[in-house]
């Protein structure tokens, strides 16, 4: 089976493991985008530590779950988001104003929408979590 969207598979498996109440989840294959997305989630405390296992193939990631995550998902296609349009996406994707994050890929790297607003940069929308 050919994987069309590696990030979507990773977030779906995290979502399913979280719903089942698991403590850990194994994600494969590993990619830079997944690692950066997980780093943003970890920075906000939605997941615990994660470990990258290099098996000289595509690699694996073991993610420790904390039980704080309600939902995470990918936005496909990756729409361009200007800074002024970010508010609309926030209203569409997130349940409330002070809750959850949208992850963007910008010229300054992969970051959440609040950091993008602070750095005054737009980009393409990758996904969300809350």
Curated annotation (Swiss-Prot):
InterPro entries: Ribosomal_uS8 (IPR000630), Ribosomal_uS8_CS (IPR047863), Ribosomal_uS8_sf (IPR035987)
PROSITE patterns according to UniProt: RIBOSOMAL_S8 (PS00053)
UniProt GO BP: cytoplasmic translation; positive regulation of cell cycle; positive regulation of cell population proliferation; response to virus; ribosomal small subunit biogenesis; translation
Disease entry from the Swiss-Prot or TrEMBL record: Diamond-Blackfan anemia 20: A form of Diamond-Blackfan anemia, a congenital non-regenerative hypoplastic anemia that usually presents early in infancy. Diamond-Blackfan anemia is characterized by a moderate to severe macrocytic anemia, erythroblastopenia, and an increased risk of malignancy. 30 to 40% of Diamond-Blackfan anemia patients present with short stature and congenital anomalies, the most frequent being craniofacial (Pierre-Robin syndrome and cleft palate), thumb and urogenital anomalies. DBA20 inheritance is autosomal dominant.
Organism encoding this protein: Homo sapiens
Protein name: Small ribosomal subunit protein uS8
GO CC annotations, alphabetized: cytoplasm; cytosol; cytosolic ribosome; cytosolic small ribosomal subunit; extracellular exosome; membrane; nucleolus; nucleoplasm
Keyword field contains Manganese: no
Molecular functions (GO terms): RNA binding; structural constituent of ribosome
Keyword Protein biosynthesis tagged: no
Family to which the UniProt record says this protein belongs: Belongs to the universal ribosomal protein uS8 family.
């Amino acid at each position: 089976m050919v994987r069309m969207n590696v990030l979507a598979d990773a977030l779906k498996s995290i979502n399913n493991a979280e719903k089942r109440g698991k403590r850990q989840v194994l994600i494969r294959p590993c990619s830079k985008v997944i690692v950066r997305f997980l780093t943003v989630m970890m920075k906000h405390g939605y997941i615990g530590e994660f470990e990258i296992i290099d098996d000289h193939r595509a690699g694996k990631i073991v993610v420790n779950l904390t039980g704080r995550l309600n939902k995470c998902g990918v936005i496909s296609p990756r729409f361009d988001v200007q800074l002024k349009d970010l508010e609309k996406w926030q209203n569409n994707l997130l349940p409330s104003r002070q809750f959850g994050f949208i992850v963007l890929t910008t010229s300054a790297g992969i970051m959440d929408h609040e950091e993008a607003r602070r750095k005054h940069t737009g980009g393409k929308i990758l996904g969300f979590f809350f």
